[in-house]
């Protein structure tokens, strides 16, 4: 492999283009278990028939772990939204349609979302009483087994030149309640400084899925708490501001 064409830099990893491959190289010290789990997630999602880059190999490059997948030529939905603000509503419609397609799939060997969230809530920097309330609420939520992306945002969708969407970055994929995945996307859009887009997105999703907005709101403090254990201080503070169970009773 000749890795000199950087196409993206993310926390703990750098993505290169090598001909018809996209190679994600993880920083030294990155958890081997997390890397192998990401590759396994991607392989399991391939089997659902969703449009995703096929995984080609897991290897070592210059002493670092790397995952090689098909390179998908195109622009991210985030880029298209930036370049064509007049088409924002059209792109959000597509965004919601793709997410609903993800939720229509099942992958029974994926980690259970509820188990992962319980672990994360236990690690969150919140008081024991609030943690107890959140664990209790999580246990009371309906148990589903839909594929959840876990990081579904416009930068993780590539639109090819012929208009075909591909979904990338399956590191956080789980099976569980789709509304938790929607709450996560809503918070991601807020974190990106796009509160108006987040609200429009949620309205669209509720309309298309015929789901009450109050149901998603019940997930917000749970999802915010579980996500607060990673990210920088500003992100943690923002997410923890949503962790007020009483407000959503």
Q: Where do the protein language model's features map onto the residues?
A:
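ATP-binding glycine-rich loop module of kinase domains
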Residues: 4-36, 43
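Conserved HxN/HPN-centered segment at the entrance to the catalytic loop
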Residues: 46-57
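Conserved short submotifs of the Hanks-type protein kinase catalytic core
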Residues: 62-76
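AlphaC helix of the protein kinase catalytic domain
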Residues: 77-86
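Internal "kinase-insert"/substrate-recognition segments embedded within catalytic cores
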Residues: 85-113
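An alpha-helical support segment within catalytic cores of ATP-dependent transferases
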Residues: 104-150, 158, 166, 241, ...
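Activation of the activation-loop gatekeeper triad in protein kinase-fold domains
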Residues: 169-173
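Helix-rich C-terminal or lid/interface subdomains of diverse kinases
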Residues: 184-249
């Amino acid at each position: 492999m000749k890795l000199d064409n950087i196409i993206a830099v993310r926390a703990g990893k750098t993505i290169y283009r090598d001909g018809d491959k996209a190679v994600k190289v993880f920083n030294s010290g990155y958890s081997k278990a997390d890397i192998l789990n990401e590759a396994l997630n991607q392989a399991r999602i391939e089997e659902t028939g969703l449009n995703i880059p096929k995984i080609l190999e897991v290897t070592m490059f210059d002493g670092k772990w790397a995952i090689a997948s098909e390179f998908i030529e195109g622009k991210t939905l985030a880029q298209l939204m930036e370049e064509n603000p007049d088409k924002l509503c059209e792109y959000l419609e597509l965004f919601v349609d793709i997410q609903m397609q993800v939720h229509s799939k099942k992958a029974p060997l994926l980690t259970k979302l509820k188990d992962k969230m319980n672990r994360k809530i236990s690690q969150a920097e919140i008081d024991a009483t609030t943690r107890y309330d959140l664990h209790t609420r999580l246990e009371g939520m309906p148990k589903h087994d839909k594929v959840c992306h876990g990081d579904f945002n416009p930068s993780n969708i590539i639109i090819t030149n012929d208009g075909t969407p591909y979904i990338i970055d399956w590191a956080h994929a789980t099976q569980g309640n789709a509304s938790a995945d929607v709450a996560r996307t809503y918070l991601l859009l807020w974190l990106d400084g796009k509160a108006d887009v987040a609200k429009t997105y949620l309205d669209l999703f509720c309309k298309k899925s015929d789901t009450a907005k109050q149901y998603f709101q019940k997930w917000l403090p749970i999802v915010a708490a579980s996500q607060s254990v990673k990210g920088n201080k500003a992100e943690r503070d923002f997410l923890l501001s949503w962790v007020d169970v009483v407000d959503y009773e």
